[in-house]
């Protein structure tokens, strides 16, 4: 009798255990997949030249760039919310020359979009973009007078429009008829010079300061952006990003251009080669040129800015 009761107890216990395991399994399988996707990417890019008894001559040099990219993206049937933080900083050192900055960026992007039709690839969107830099910038070899600083300048874009997302988000196109652009120049010395398009200081005939330069310039205009990310061939990824802006109130039709084209060539999980170019044109950024050592000015106006990159990088993603 005792043995029968013991066997019945074991049988009931096993049934309860299996039922509990089955319930837990079903609960896990019914948990909704997270609609958030995250990306954390750290990249270190290096270039180096070294010469020993090289008959053609040359300077030893080493360059390094650190890049951090963080993304937090949300998407459901009707709503998309994309957030991105980008930062990069680069330095270069050559023999018999001071340490020089080669790259400096802090950028924050956020886009919120809504569609009322699941079949549509166009979203009514609000887009925010902010850019500035970490440290002082100089027109080398002159390091006595900075030409830019942290928050001098800083750019802020905020607009409403419509954005297209391809099926796999490889291609994004944003069109905004109304975007507010704010240019901050918080350093008063740069603001007094009228740097980056803000109103300069006003002086009387004796050179006495009458009114300080403005620290803020506000514009309203048209904003267009596109980004295309694709794998052009095996282990070669391309990112082509273009931003265009034109102010309604001041010289409408003069377009500010920000165009980045980058290729990542994957060698293995943690090593890549990087080839890239960055073109900037801003009608408010005036470049100075001198004729001679006396500092005689011959030109003051906007110019196309170009930066190129070729290097080997170490990548860590988590």
Regions found by a protein language model. Name each.
Residues 44-50, 76-78, 87-93, 128-136, ...:
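Transmembrane beta-strands of outer-membrane beta-barrel pores
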């Amino acid at each position: 009798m005792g043995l029968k009761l013991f066997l019945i107890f074991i049988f009931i216990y096993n049934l309860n255990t299996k039922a509990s395991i089955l319930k837990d399994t079903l609960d896990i399988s019914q948990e909704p997949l997270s609609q958030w996707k995250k990306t954390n990417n750290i990249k270190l890019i290096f270039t180096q030249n070294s010469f020993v008894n090289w008959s053609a001559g040359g300077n030893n040099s080493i360059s390094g760039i650190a890049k951090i990219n963080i993304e937090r993206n949300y998407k459901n049937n009707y709503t998309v919310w994309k957030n991105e933080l980008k930062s990069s900083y680069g330095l270069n050192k050559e023999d018999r020359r001071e340490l020089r900055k080669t790259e400096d960026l802090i950028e924050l992007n956020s886009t919120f979009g809504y569609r009322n039709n699941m079949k549509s690839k166009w979203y009514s969107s609000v887009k925010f973009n902010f850019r500035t830099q970490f440290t002082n910038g100089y027109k080398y070899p002159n390091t006595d007078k900075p030409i830019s600083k942290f928050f001098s300048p800083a750019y802020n874009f905020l607009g409403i429009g419509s954005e297209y997302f391809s099926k796999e988000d490889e291609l994004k196109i944003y069109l905004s008829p109304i975007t507010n652009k704010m240019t901050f120049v918080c350093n008063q010395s740069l603001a007094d010079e009228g740097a980056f398009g803000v109103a300069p200081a006003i002086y009387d005939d004796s050179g006495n300061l009458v009114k300080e330069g403005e620290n803020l310039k506000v514009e309203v205009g048209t904003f267009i952006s596109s980004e295309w990310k694709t794998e052009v061939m095996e282990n070669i990824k391309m990112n082509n990003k273009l931003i265009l802006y034109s102010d309604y109130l001041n010289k409408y039709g003069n377009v500010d251009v920000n165009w980045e084209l980058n290729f990542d060539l994957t060698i293995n999980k943690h090593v890549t080669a990087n080839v890239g170019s960055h073109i900037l044109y801003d009608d408010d950024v005036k470049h100075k040129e001198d004729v001679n050592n006396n500092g005689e000015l011959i030109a003051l106006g906007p110019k196309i800015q170009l930066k190129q990159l070729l290097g080997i990088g170490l990548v860590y993603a988590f």
